[in-house]
UniProtKB/Swiss-Prot annotation:
It catalyses: an acyl phosphate + H2O = a carboxylate + phosphate + H(+). Coiled coil: none annotated. It comes from the Bacteria. Residues 1-83 form the Acylphosphatase-like domain. The active site is at residues 12, 30. This is Acylphosphatase. SUPFAM superfamilies: Acylphosphatase/BLUF domain-like. Gene3D superfamilies: 3.30.70.100. Signal peptide: none annotated. InterPro entries: Acylphosphatase, Acylphosphatase-like_dom, Acylphosphatase-like_dom_sf, Acylphosphatase_CS. It comes from Synechococcus sp. (strain CC9605). It is an enzyme of class 3 (hydrolase). The keyword Hydrolase applies. Its EC number is 3.6.1.7.
Length: 83
């Protein structure tokens, strides 16, 4: 979960591009409470790089907190923006 000023700043689209560049699969979506949720799978180094990116976000974002969680692996081979 990503908290702060993370909606209406292009966070999902930017996260999608970054994840694809890193070869990560999963998804990103806005939540109704103003947070952004990301589920990502991939090599540990790529996941660390995506997390570091999420801690800053795109220009205009003001990330306050990134809270990771461990989820079951799905084996998907794409990354998408969910609505």
């Amino acid at each position: 979960m990503i908290e702060g000023r993370v909606q209406r700043v292009g966070f999902r689209a930017s996260c999608n591009r970054r994840a694809l560049d890193l070869g990560i699969s999963g998804w990103v979506r806005n939540l109704s409470d103003g947070r952004v949720e990301v589920q990502a799978e991939g090599p540990p180094l790529a996941l660390s790089e995506l997390r570091a990116w999420c801690e800053v976000g795109p220009p205009g974002a003001r990330v306050v907190r990134v809270t990771p969680s461990q989820l079951p692996i799905t084996g998907d081979d794409w990354f998408e923006v969910r609505y």
